[in-house]
Amino acid sequence: VLESVKNAVSYGVRTEDDIEADSLDELFESLVPLDDLLHEIRRCIISEEEISDDASSTLKHIRRAMKQTNQKIHTQLTALVSSASNQDKLQDAIVTMRNGRYCIPVKQEYRSSFQGMIHDQSASGNTLFIEPMSVVTLNNELKELEGKEQSEIEHILSMLSEQASYVVDDLAHDQKTLVLLDFIFAKAKYAKDLDASKPIFREDGIINIKQ
């Protein structure tokens, strides 16, 4: 609604030199641009799936910590799977995710070679996905940070909702007006596509039908 109102207001602005006033001017002029709210939403929300790091200093700090923790985990696990002494013990020299935890794929017969927590196994049972003890603490820190991130996102969305609640009447009015304008323009386009014209009605009530 906010974006549509901004676009509609820009479209509806006209000067005497542009075009003569018409019956839609009153509708366009009744729209209430809520630029402050729109700016705040744009600043905080990148898409329906993503909140901007700049939405709050707290969120930026949390995500920076998450990135650093991720890098530490990957550094340790990459060193582990790249070690020549482990090549025969691993099903693949990769780092994978199981149940939200970073793991390595260990061959069943080498289970005792790696201290850690088993989070999953392959359908055949030949591969165990183990979270090495060396990264358990880091994985725990990452899960905690993910929880804090979600809480902060919910807080940001709550604040935006509160700001929107202060102008809910204006939002409702703008939405109703936009629907009416959309209906009017749809009728106009349909009439243009049909090359239609407005009928002229006689005041005496007589209808002259011509074949």
Label each PLM-derived region with a short phrase.
Residues 1-2, 9-12:
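N-terminal alpha-helical targeting/anchoring segments
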Residues 27-33:
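Extended, well-ordered alpha-helical scaffold/bundle regions in very large, multi-domain proteins
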Residues 5-6, 15-25, 37-211:
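Alpha-helical coupling/stalk and coiled-coil linker elements that connect catalytic or binding modules
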